[in-house]
Amino acid sequence: MVAVTVMRKSRNFVGPSPPTPPAEITTTLELSSIDRVPGLRHNVRSLHVFRRHKNSGPVVDGDSRRPAAVIRAALARALADYPAFAGRFVGSLLAGDACVACTGEGAWFVEAAADCSLDDVNGLEYPLMISEEELLPAPEDGVDPTSIPVMMQVTEFTCGGFILGLVAVHTLADGLGAAQFITAVAELARGMDKLRVAPVWDRSLIPNPPKLPPGPPPSFQSFGFQHFSTDVTSDRIAHVKAEYFQTFGQYCSTFDVATAKVWQARTRAVGYKPEIQVHVCFFANTRHLLTQVLPKDGGYYGNCFYPVTVTAIAEDVATKELLDVIKIIRDGKARLPMEFAKWASGDVKVDPYALTFEHNVLFVSDWTRLGFFEVDYGWGTPNHIIPFTYADYMAVAVLGAPPMPKKGTRIMTQCVENKCIKEFQDEMKAFI
C-alpha cells in the first residue's frame, strides 16, 4: 500500500460575497415541520472524486485556477443567494421552535493537498487507501459539527484531480436541496453570472399538521454492521425489468430491483424467524404532490419527503421470487400519495417521521437521482461519489453509480454483521 500524506493547508469560515447586508444579519428564517424532525439534525457526509480533465494541468500553489481556490470563491458567491447555509441554528428542535439565523458567519472550508495521484490510491475505490477522516472536513476542536450547516474540504492531488468532501446538516435541506446548492456553487465556479434555478426558502409551503404526542425514544443499539459494495450491470437490471413487465404488465424501476434484491439477500442471510415482520424504509420525494403550492420553476431546497415503510413477513421476502418482492415494494410506493395526504391533514395517530432503528428495518437511499452526479465545477462531472450515510444502529443500503466509464448501479451496504456477511455477499454476487 502506498504511504499517503494529506496536508490541510488552511481551515476557516467562508462568508457570503458580497457580505450579507446589515439589515439581514439578524434575519431569522423559519424551518418547516419536516425540517424540525429531531432525527434530521445529523451530518450527511460524502466524497466526490474528480479525475484530471484532459485540459487541466498539475496543481500549482498560487494558481487562481486551482480547484480549491475556484470552489472557495464560488462558495462565497453562492452563500449570498443561500444565506441560510452561512447562518446558524437557533432555538430547540424538541420544543418545536428551531430556526436559522442568517448571521453570515459562513461555511467551514478546508484546503488540502495529497502527495500522490488519484491513480496511486486506485481512484479512491474500496477498500479506501485514504481514510474518510482525512478527506472530510472537521471543525475546530470543541465545535459541534451539526451546528454548522455546511462544511467542505477540497483535497488536490498531484495529477490535477481533486476530491471534494462535503458535510451538510440534513435539517436545512434534503438530498435534492443539498444537490441544488452544490450545483449553484458549481455554476458560479464555471463563470455563470446568474443561477439557473433561483433558490426558494419559504418553509410555510410545507404542510404543518398538529404535532402528535411523542412516542418512546428510538433505540440506538450498535449492531456492528459490515460494509459491502457491489456493482450491477445495466443489462442485468434491464433483464429483471423486462421479466417484471412480462409477469405483471407494469414497469418497475432500477430502485425497485436493487432494493428488492438487497432486502431479500439480507433477510436470507440474517435468517429471521419466518413469522417476523421485516421492513424497508426510504425517503420518497413529495415535491410532485405539492405542485399547487411549490414554485413551478422549482428551487425549493428544504426537506420535502415522506418516509415510506414497506412491511412483509420474513418468510415471504426470503422465499418468494425476486419479482414478487419487487411487487411488494411497488405496492408500498403506490400508497405514498394517500399516506402523505393523510399526514398533511393531521389524519394519523402515529408520526411517520418518528423513525425506529431496529435490526429488522433496512433503510435505502438512492443517490443517483439527486443531481450530485451532474455537478461540474469546470473540470467535468465526478468520476464517482462515496456517500457515508452510515450509523452503526442503522441497516443501510445506498444506491449510486460505479466509477466512469462503467455503467450500471453501485449498491453500497452496511446492513449485516460479520457472522452473516459471507452469506449476504454470496446472495448479492449470485444476482449479478
UniProtKB/Swiss-Prot annotation:
The active site is at residues 170, 376. Gene3D superfamilies: Chloramphenicol acetyltransferase-like domain. Keywords: Acyltransferase, Transferase. InterPro entries: CAT-like_dom_sf, Plant_acyltransferase. The keyword Transferase applies. Pfam families: Transferase (PF02458). Disulfide bonds: none annotated. GO terms for molecular function: hydroxycinnamoyltransferase activity. Its EC number is 2.3.1.-. It comes from the Eukaryota. Belongs to the plant acyltransferase family. Involved in the incorporation of ferulate into the cell wall. May act as arabinoxylan feruloyl transferase. Plants over-expressing AT5 have significant increase of ferulate in leaf cell wall. This is Acyl transferase 5. It comes from Oryza sativa subsp. japonica (Rice).
